[in-house]
Amino acid sequence: MRKQVNKGYNKKIETEDQALPGETFISSLEVDHIVSMDKIASMDGFGDLTKKQQLELLNNPENFTGLSKSANTSKQSKSYEKWTHYKKGTPDEIEVSPDFRSKMITREKQLERILQKQIEDFNKE
């Protein structure tokens, strides 16, 4: 997945962080689940899947994006709706880019429907 999220990305040049306004980084992007693993594991029917099906669902390539190390560490397993600030409650607090969040919240909701359908389809097999 790391290769997928870094395709066409130059890790050797300073890059503006798309999620954290004013921040830059020089490194590879980290892999982040758009819909968290915790959320997927709690979806209706997930527990009825075989381990192989669960892994296939958790590794659905559509459900990954690349984030800077700082952004990924800050977000953890929060939804994009709940992830509002980097270093929240500190003097260095930064609001996550509203445009980025809005785009990712929309994508997250789309993926929740896609993943739920994938679960339902697996359970029909």
Predicted regions and their residues:
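Catalytic cores of phosphodiester-bond-cleaving enzymes
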Residues: Q54, L58-E125
